[in-house]
């Protein structure tokens, strides 16, 4: 399986064979695509981060409250099932590639556990 990350504004540029899956807490109005909420940040620490912009706080809480509670292999298997066995998916959230976003933490977690992940960078 090939896993990309990207942001909602770039979904329109994804190749046709890539299945986009939102991993945000709340997808944009009008989003008709797939959603996988288990990787979404918890409101409790997300709201504090929105006020403080303390990335270290966010990383600590995202890791302990989200990623450490999940099995990476189970997550990948659930994403495969959700995507109807597509061999290429894109995990989608809001921020552009250079901005802080939990999808970068997800990508690191997946990579550290043997899955190849990269930011989808084709833009039209």
Regions found by a protein language model. Name each.
Residues 1-124:
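Residues lining hydrophobic/aromatic ligand-binding pockets adjacent to catalytic sites
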């Amino acid at each position: 399986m090939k896993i990309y990350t990207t942001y909602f504004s770039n979904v329109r540029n994804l190749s046709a064979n890539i299945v986009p899956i939102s991993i945000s807490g709340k997808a944009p109005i009008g989003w008709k695509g797939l959603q996988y909420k288990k990787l979404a940040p918890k409101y409790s620490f997300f709201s504090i981060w929105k006020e403080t912009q303390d990335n270290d706080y966010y990383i600590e809480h995202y890791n302990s409250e989200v990623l450490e509670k999940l099995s990476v292999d189970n997550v990948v298997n659930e994403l495969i099932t959700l995507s109807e066995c597509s061999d290429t998916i894109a995990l989608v959230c809001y921020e552009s590639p250079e901005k802080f976003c939990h999808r970068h933490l997800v990508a690191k977690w997946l990579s550290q556990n043997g899955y190849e992940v990269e930011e989808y960078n084709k833009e039209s």
